[in-house]
């Protein structure tokens, strides 16, 4: 199996769009609706992202079926759970996600630089990916992600520290909410 970063790049050549398969929790038949989305939209996508609140409503067999169907259509599967616990919990959670067919997991780097780096290294050994959150789209997230911190004589905002950790930790991608175009621009310049 090839690396996640190579697989997503290959899929993105056809289309750079990742479907955020985010349904209202009250919507019934999530599995069948998700399978229908994959079958109808796969030619326009490179991947599908499933949020935590939807995963909680599906059993292991349903999740595996969704991921297999996505793979059969050439799509990458991303678990958007913003994983951010102690290292052992992160590793066990990631292993369970991999066993259900996910290709990558979205994490919140609040877990710490070392835990993030270790999760990336272990995931990469299994050809899986880690996508790290830098800043959330929710308006109230500004209060935390833009906190000014001082770290070894360097003042910066928390999202900038998270970006530094993502780069040095060799994550496969970062996430910045679309509601913050200046921060997207900052992150893009920092990566290139």
Q: Which residues fall in each region the model found?
A:
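Conserved N-terminal beta1-alpha1 strand-loop-helix module at the mouth
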Residues: 1-77, 154-159, 165-172
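Charge-biased, low-complexity intrinsically disordered regions
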Residues: 3, 57, 86, 182, ...
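Conserved anion-binding
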Residues: 13, 23-26, 87-181, 190
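General beta-strand structural signal in soluble alpha/beta enzymes
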Residues: 19, 49-50, 77-81, 106-107, ...
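Conserved PLP phosphate-binding loop immediately N-terminal to the Schiff-base lysine helix
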Residues: 53-56, 82-90
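Short beta-strand/loop segments at the ligand-binding rim of alpha/beta enzyme cores
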Residues: 70-82, 127-130, 189-192
């Amino acid at each position: 199996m090839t690396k996640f970063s190579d697989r997503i790049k290959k899929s993105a050549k056809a289309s750079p769009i990742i479907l955020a398969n985010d349904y209202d929790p009250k919507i019934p038949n999530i599995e069948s609706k998700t399978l229908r989305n994959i079958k109808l939209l796969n030619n326009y996508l490179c991947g599908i992202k499933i949020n935590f609140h939807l995963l909680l409503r599906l059993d292991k067999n349903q999740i595996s079926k969704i991921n297999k169907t996505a793979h059969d259509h050439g799509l990458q599967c991303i678990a958007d759970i913003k994983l951010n616990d102690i290292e052992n919990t992160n590793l066990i959670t990631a292993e369970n996600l991999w066993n259900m067919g996910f290709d990558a997991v979205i994490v919140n780097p609040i877990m710490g630089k070392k835990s993030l780096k270790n999760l990336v290294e272990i995931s990469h050994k299994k050809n899986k990916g880690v996508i790290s959150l830098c800043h959330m789209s929710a308006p109230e997230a500004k209060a935390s992600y833009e906190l000014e911190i001082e770290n070894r004589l360097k003042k910066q905002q928390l999202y900038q520290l998270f970006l530094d950790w993502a780069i040095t930790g060799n994550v496969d991608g970062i996430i910045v909410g679309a509601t913050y175009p200046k921060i997207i621009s900052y992150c893009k310049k920092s990566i290139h």
